[in-house]
Amino acid sequence: MLGKLFGKAGERPEADAHALPVPRGRRNGTYPVRALGDTRVLALVEAADAGDWDGVKAALAPFDLGRDHRVLGELADLDGVQDWIGRAVEQDTEHRATALLISGARHIAWGWEARTADRAVNVTREQWRVFHERLEIAEEHLLLAAEARPHWVTPWCRLLTSARGMSLPDDVKRTRYEAALRRDPLDLETHLERVSQLQPRWGGEPGEATRYAREVFTGAPEGHRLGCVVAMAHIEDWVESDSPGCLDLPYIQKELRDAARHSILHPAYERRPGWQQDFNMFAMALSLASESVAAPQVFHELGGAYTPWPWRYMSQPEKAYARFRRHA
């Protein structure tokens, strides 16, 4: 049955020579994805964790940091990078743009660590001060990186995040959004950031983000990960809603099912490092919608692989993943 619904029955993607082995003795049959599930990314993370700038540069060779948001994200989320990346910015003229990009991305994540994910009314004055101080450094470094490498899309996408955090004017956000899309009109992370900006908690109107996601998705080629924008828009709607069952509607179930088939479940979808996060977005959205056709296929393809995003919206993310997986 699943073969008829999703394509060639029983056919799985070819084994990835760089895939990290699945951990043994998995609790609930699930496991957190480490370093995007890729041995090359693990080498990058280990070099960065050791403060080895030469090792970081060598490990970055297979990747295009100006376009690969997920690889950049591994460095941005790594505690301690802020302690040594400034020296690379100052001393390595040849690779300064790369160092600036990493520093900018790290300072955004580091800033949000100071602010926390709490509601704005619960953030202290000191937390706000540190948050803005770190975002100002991020802004400076990302703008310099964008100037040095005009074809890069990742600095502009990260500048959208810092603009949201600093509550910059809408025209600034629009300029950065357009700059990112000029470099890659189908850039998923840019569109996901726009979905976040359009949420009521960030000044948007109810339903605006979902309408935007639908419009964006109409231009997505078959097998393109841009379909995730639909899944994430519905997850954001769930976050904003007071009703836990707000997505449990037939038309939403169908919309998510169609988006999954067109993107991550399509044979043309390319499983690059971190592909598990795309599947986790759909796994969460389909589960919240109580969808029963595509959800089992998505969880099956994941094989228990869990990514914190977007499950961190739940109080016990990994337990929620395991529960939905068990009932899919």
Question: Residue locations for each model-derived region?
Answer:
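Carboxylate/His-rich catalytic cores and anion/metal-binding grooves
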Residues: 103
